[in-house]
Curated annotation (Swiss-Prot):
Pathway(s) served: Amino-acid biosynthesis; L-histidine biosynthesis; L-histidine from 5-phospho-alpha-D-ribose 1-diphosphate: step 4/9
Species of provenance: Methanococcus voltae
CDD domains: HisA
EC code: 5.3.1.16
GN (gene name): hisA
Name the record gives this protein: 1-(5-phosphoribosyl)-5-[(5-phosphoribosylamino)methylideneamino] imidazole-4-carboxamide isomerase
Lineage, top ranks: Archaea, Methanobacteriati, Methanobacteriota, Methanomada group, Methanococci
Reactions mediated catalytically: 1-(5-phospho-beta-D-ribosyl)-5-[(5-phospho-beta-D-ribosylamino)methylideneamino]imidazole-4-carboxamide = 5-[(5-phospho-1-deoxy-D-ribulos-1-ylimino)methylamino]-1-(5-phospho-beta-D-ribosyl)imidazole-4-carboxamide
Length: 242
């Protein structure tokens, strides 16, 4: 199981938001590429980049940071944030992004996933599923759909999604710990890899995710607030036998 540090970028800086709110930030650093390098030096085997400006305003102001991170890092990079068109996806794949994360547009139009999979290959397509109160939410968590994560996950898998990034919004960015059940339901019902995200506060949380069989866990706030050291987490999780 990969432990994947999040590098969230806003206006060229590395930030961590609380509950996705651009006005509420846990932390802020000037050089996202330096942060990415630090995580790799501390053992990260994969990075999770989020372009918050792309996600919030449709602007790609963080592209220079992204290019720098890709050039300097020798680990796979997955990236999301405001990716809405085939052109967006192709540009990022050409740039060297290993997995491009799409969200709302995939849930609203699963056929789009099929088009993308044909164009760049399923392995490059990761769909972000966000859930609140047991239902998938879209548009920056503002709009609730009628689908459960498993229902939507099955549709997306059928359409060619290569993996799912699942965020339980109820716990995201609050440092309250995790509710493992919705993630376990996805792992149990889908055949593609599930990457978990949201609410990790302790190494024990990571162990819980390993027990249910997720492929990786994205960790943000807990690392930036120094709840635990990345290297310690990697060692503990790798040594834990199920």
């Amino acid at each position: 199981m990969y432990i994947i540090p999040a590098v969230d970028m806003k206006e060229g800086k590395c930030v961590q938001l609380i509950q996705g709110d651009p006005t509420k930030r846990h932390v802020e650093y000037d050089n996202p590429d330096e942060i990415a390098k630090m995580w790799i030096e501390n053992g990260a085997e994969m990075l999770h980049l989020v372009d918050l400006d792309g996600a919030i305003d449709g602007e790609r102001v963080n592209l220079p940071c992204v290019k720098k991170i890709i050039q300097e890092s020798k680990v796979p990079v997955q990236m999301g944030g405001g990716i809405r068109t085939i052109q967006d996806v192709e540009e990022l794949v050409d740039l060297g992004i290993n997995k491009v994360i799409i969200g709302t547009v995939a849930v609203q139009n699963p056929d789009f996933v099929e088009q993308l999979a044909k164009k760049v290959g399923s392995d490059k397509i990761m769909v972000a599923l966000d859930a609140k109160d047991g239902k998938v939410v879209i548009k920056g968590w503002k709009e609730k759909t009628e689908y459960t994560p498993v229902q939507m996950g099955k549709i997306l898998e059928e359409k060619g999604a290569g993996s799912i990034l699942f965020t339980n919004v109820d716990s995201e960015g609050l440092l309250n710990g995790i509710n493992i059940t919705p993630t376990k339901e996805l792992v149990d019902n889908l055949n593609i890899p599930i990457i978990a995200s949201g609410g990790v506060t302790t190494i024990e949380d990571l162990i819980e995710f390993k027990k249910i069989g997720v492929a990786g866990v994205v960790v943000g706030s807990a690392l930036y607030k120094n709840n635990f050291k990345l290297q310690d987490a990697i060692n503990t999780v790798n040594n834990f036998k199920i």
